[in-house]
């Protein structure tokens, strides 16, 4: 699963996920893309599950690019622990997603197969997405 190798600080503030994506909004590497039209957080497990679904569907053909990376740690306290005593330990990693961000790209397959593969991937993700092409944004 995806996670950073090293970080300057182990824990991070919660922050706010506002605004629209300004970078990574165009299909740059492949011919087809899966773009977020909603906002939210994608965990490393969700990103990997969607990648596996696409890879299995396109079999040996084509190439897939993952355009997002889970670089934000989410901490959690253990079960049945009293309040206080500091922040919990980092439990998993997420990527914060704004509307307009291209999540995955694909090349080397026809459009029908790409649409099917992205539909399988979108079912694994908690945010609404849409199919985009390199030429039609």
From Swiss-Prot:
Top-level taxon of the source organism: Bacteria
Record key words, sorted: Ribonucleoprotein, Ribosomal protein, RNA-binding, rRNA-binding, tRNA-binding
Gene3D superfamilies, alphabetized: Ribosomal protein L10e/L16 (3.90.1170.10)
PROSITE patterns: RIBOSOMAL_L16_1, RIBOSOMAL_L16_2
Pfam families, per database record: Ribosomal_L16
Span list, region Disordered: 1-22
Bias-annotated ranges (Basic residues): 1-14
Keyword rRNA-binding attributed: yes
MF terms (GO), sorted A to Z: rRNA binding; structural constituent of ribosome; tRNA binding
Any GO CC annotation of this UniProt entry: cytosolic large ribosomal subunit
InterPro entries: Ribosomal_uL16 (IPR047873), Ribosomal_uL16_bact-type (IPR000114), Ribosomal_uL16_CS (IPR020798), Ribosomal_uL16_dom (IPR016180), Ribosomal_uL16_sf (IPR036920)
A single BP term in Gene Ontology: translation
Function: Binds 23S rRNA and is also seen to make contacts with the A and possibly P site tRNAs.
Subunit details: Part of the 50S ribosomal subunit.
Similarity comment: Belongs to the universal ribosomal protein uL16 family.
NCBIfam families documented for this protein: rplP_bact (TIGR01164)
This protein's name: Large ribosomal subunit protein uL16
Species whose genome carries this gene: Dechloromonas aromatica (strain RCB)
Gene: rplP
């Amino acid at each position: 699963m995806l996670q950073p190798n090293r970080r300057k600080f182990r824990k991070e503030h919660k922050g706010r996920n506002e605004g629209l994506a300004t970078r990574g909004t165009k299909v740059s590497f492949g011919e087809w893309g899966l773009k977020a039209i909603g906002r939210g957080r994608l965990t490393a497990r969700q990103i990997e599950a969607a990648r596996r679904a696409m890879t299995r569907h396109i079999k040996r053909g084509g190439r897939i690019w993952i355009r997002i990376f889970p670089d934000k740690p989410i901490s959690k306290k253990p079960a049945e622990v009293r309040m206080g005593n500091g922040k919990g330990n980092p439990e998993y990693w997420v990527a914060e997603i704004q509307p307009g961000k291209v999540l995955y790209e694909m090349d080397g397959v026809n459009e029908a197969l790409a649409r099917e593969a992205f539909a399988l991937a979108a079912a694994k993700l908690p945010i609404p997405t849409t199919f985009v092409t390199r030429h039609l944004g």
